[in-house]
Structures are given as C-alpha cells and as structure tokens.
C-alpha cells in the first residue's frame, strides 16, 4: 500500500508455453488489478504443442490446437507481446527486448521453454530440413509433405514416434535414424524396443540404429540425401530433426541469475535474485525422486510449476514437492506408458515381464523395495487408470516387499499391489 492506496503490481512473464500461460491466468485469479505482460517469440496465444504433428496428416485443424480460443489473453486483460528478450537487468528491474524496448517489472517469471537441438552438420541449412517444436514448424512441414515422397527422421524419441504415424497416413516412405541401440531411449530398453521395432518395420518403415548423420547433401540448395557415419547415403525429400531440446537461457548470461543446465530455483520456484521466478522447461529444481536438481521438460510439470510460481508471486506460500514424470506414446496399435525412473542403475532393482509372442511388457524399478518407476507396453492397456495409479504409488512410497511375485503375473492387479501398500 502506497499513500493509502494499493500499488498496482507489474507482472512480466517470458514465454507463452504451458508454464507461462498457466501462470498468467493464475495471477489474474489472485490479482484482478495487476498489470500482466506476457512476451513470446511466437505470434500465437496458448496452444496444445503436443498435438502440432497432427497438422501434417490433417488429423486436426489449426483451430483445434487453441484449446481456450485465440482471444484468451484479451479476455483476461493480459498484454501479449511478440518479441525476443535480449537481456534481464535485475538491478533496474527491467528486461530489454530485441526491438530496443524495455519493460519494467515488480515480479518476473522466466518460462522461456526450450529450443530443438540442431548439430552443426554439413549442409544443415539446405531447404527441406525441419524441426517439429512449434506451430510454425508443423505448418512448414505440412506444406512441404504435399510434394514429397520420402522423409528421414533424425532421432527416435517420442516426437519421432508421433511423427512416423502421421507421415505414414499420407503415404510417405519413412526412414528413422537413431544414435542409441534402440528407439525411445528415455523410456524403452533394448528388449522392449524390439517389440515396437518389429511392428514399425512391418509397416515398411526403415530403421537405422546406432547410426549418426554426418552430412546433408543437396541439389540447387534443396535437400536430396542424408549421409550416415557408416557411409550409407539415403535419398530423401525432407528431413525432420528430433534429437532433443535445450532450455532457452542464453539471454540470462551476465544477469546474475544462477544457471547450469537450466535456471536454479527453490521449492517456491524462486531464483537467487529477489522477485525473479522460473518455471517449466527451464527450471532446474531439486526432485526427491532423483535426489538432485533436475529439469522436468513435460507439459504437466510446466503447468504445475507455472501455477505454483504465480501463487507465490501474488503473496501465497506454496511449495513444489516434486513431480512424477509421465510420458506416453501410441503407435500402430501399441501404447506405452513410462512413469518415474524407467532404467535401472546401481542400488536399484528391476522386475520385468516380457512376452514377445503376446507383444506385452511390464517393467518395474524398485529402490529399497519401494516403487520408483514403471514401463508398461501393450496393445490394450488402460492408460487412464494406470497413469494415476502408478503416479500415486511412486509419490506415496509403495513398499512391494511382500508382493514382488505378483508383479510377474500376466493378469496383474495394479490396484491390489500398489494402492493397498501405500505408506501413510
């Protein structure tokens, strides 16, 4: 309160993804008079990023991506600015934009998301080489595939799994190149991947494992082939790069904000600088499941962190208690769910049940008899039941010391094993 009147607070949010958009709307719920400014390097309001690949096969329209409409910010009195942030200057409490403008803040949330990793391959700037991170990327790919017959996907992770399904729908010849020994390395192990690889190959899709791109070749500045480390050359019209993401934090160099892989934040989503918060793909925060500060680049976690940051920026005292990462893919009749830690390591135990004949897999990761992760793959799995059950079992510390044998049963009763053994 200043001179008997409440000061109107200035909230500035960098990034319009799930963390930034959620935070903006949450701030408005708690502060109806505050000035909220959201800055994004995209010319779109909040949209469902995980569905953009469906534009390629026309499985959805562009309008379907805008879950809350295209006037979300106007309807909530949020100022939207399309621009790039060049610098954050904490001592002056303002940010500098690419166009030279400065914006003052009382509270700043950095939710700048990530960018696709692109290596310095020879020929990487040829026409026909794309990424699939944002809406503009997807629109460009959707336009190019109309006159294409072949596509090479560099990387075999979750985005690649979604992409091949859509490229197959429109009849493209597809080749996947993956550096690891198996597909979706973050979720699958070699045994599980074999089941999916078999089905993908049956669809006429080519897979190159333990391979790397060394060069893109072209004619008249247009992509014509991809050269691998082995010397093999693959003719193609389009290449899509899906080898990973990196947090957008370069603009914070020399700002004083503590960064490493991401932006270090405490359990309130606060950085080391007063009144500056971070959330989403850029936030590096201690997680009890991993017992170390980590990045959690998932949609659900970004929304959760954005909401917590917003509440604390408006005077609440809410803490982030960690999250259980959940990822899922669906491809050619298979569904897979990866929850928590899905790869065993030192001092961890693994219990797995794999049937190549029935094309079914279950893997559980235990630490001192407590469930810390699970991977489920099959043709008919109830993911709407499994996701919350497994997430709760991990979060609430389920001890399975007396029910390990049940994990190997074909007709497993997840509720019986996990929900009845939660430590409270």
Predicted regions and their residues:
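Mid-to-C-terminal Rossmann-like scaffold of FAD/NAD(P)H-dependent oxidoreductases
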Residues: 8-9, 16, 29, 282-384, ...
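Residue-level detector of alpha-helix initiation sites
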Residues: 13, 17-18, 43, 114-116, ...
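Cofactor-binding loop segments of dinucleotide-utilizing enzymes, especially the Rossmann-like FAD-
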Residues: 16, 39-41, 134, 156, ...
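A Rossmann-like FAD-binding core segment of flavoenzymes
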Residues: 33-35, 76-97, 103, 170-267
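FAD-site-proximal beta/loop scaffold in flavoenzymes
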Residues: 125-146, 220-227, 232-308
């Amino acid at each position: 309160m200043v001179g008997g009147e409440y000061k109107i607070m200035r909230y500035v949010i960098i990034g319009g993804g799930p963390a930034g958009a959620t935070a903006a709307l949450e701030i408005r719920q708690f502060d109806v008079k505050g000035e909220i400014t959201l800055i994004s390097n995209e010319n779109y309001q909040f949209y469902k990023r995980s569905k953009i690949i469906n534009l390629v096969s026309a499985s959805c329209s562009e309008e379907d991506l805008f879950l809350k409409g295209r006037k979300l910010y106007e309807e909530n009195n949020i100022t939207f600015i399309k621009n790039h942030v060049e610098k954050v200057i904490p001592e002056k409490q303002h940010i500098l934009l690419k166009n030279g403008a400065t914006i003052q803040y009382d509270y700043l949330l950095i939710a700048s998301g990530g960018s696709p990793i692109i290596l310095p391959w020879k020929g990487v700037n040829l026409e026909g080489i794309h990424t699939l991170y944002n809406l503009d990327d997807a629109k460009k790919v959707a336009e190019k595939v109309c006159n294409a017959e072949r596509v090479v996907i560099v990387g075999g992770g979750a985005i690649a799994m979604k992409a091949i399904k859509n490229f197959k729908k429109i009849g493209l010849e597809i080749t996947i190149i993956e550096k690891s020994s198996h597909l979706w390395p973050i979720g699958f192990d070699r045994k599980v991947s074999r089941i999916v690889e078999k089905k993908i190959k049956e669809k006429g899709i080519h897979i190159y494992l333990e391979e790397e791109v060394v060069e893109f070749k072209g004619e008249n500045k247009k992509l014509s082939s991809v050269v691998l480390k082995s010397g093999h050359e693959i003719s193609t019209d389009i290449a899509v790069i899906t080898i990973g993401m990196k947090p957008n934090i370069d603009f914070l160099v020399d700002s004083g904000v503590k960064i490493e892989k991401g932006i270090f934040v405490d359990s309130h989503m606060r950085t080391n600088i007063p009144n500056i918060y971070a959330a989403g793909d850029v936030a590096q925060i201690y997680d009890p499941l991993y017992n170390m500060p980590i990045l959690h680049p998932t949609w659900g976690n970004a929304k959760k962190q954005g909401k917590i940051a917003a509440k604390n920026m408006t005077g609440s005292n809410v803490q982030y208690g960690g999250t259980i990462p959940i990822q899922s893919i669906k491809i050619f009749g298979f569904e897979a769910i990866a929850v928590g830690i899905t790869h065993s390591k030192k001092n961890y135990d693994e219990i797995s049940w794999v049937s190549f004949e029935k094309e079914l897999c279950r893997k559980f990761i235990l630490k001192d008899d407590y469930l810390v992760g699970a991977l489920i793959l099959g043709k008919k799995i109830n993911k709407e039941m499994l996701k919350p059950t497994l997430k709760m079992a991990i979060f609430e510390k389920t001890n399975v010391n007396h029910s390990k044998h049940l994990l190997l049963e074909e007709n497993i009763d997840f509720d019986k094993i996990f929900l009845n053994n939660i430590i409270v």
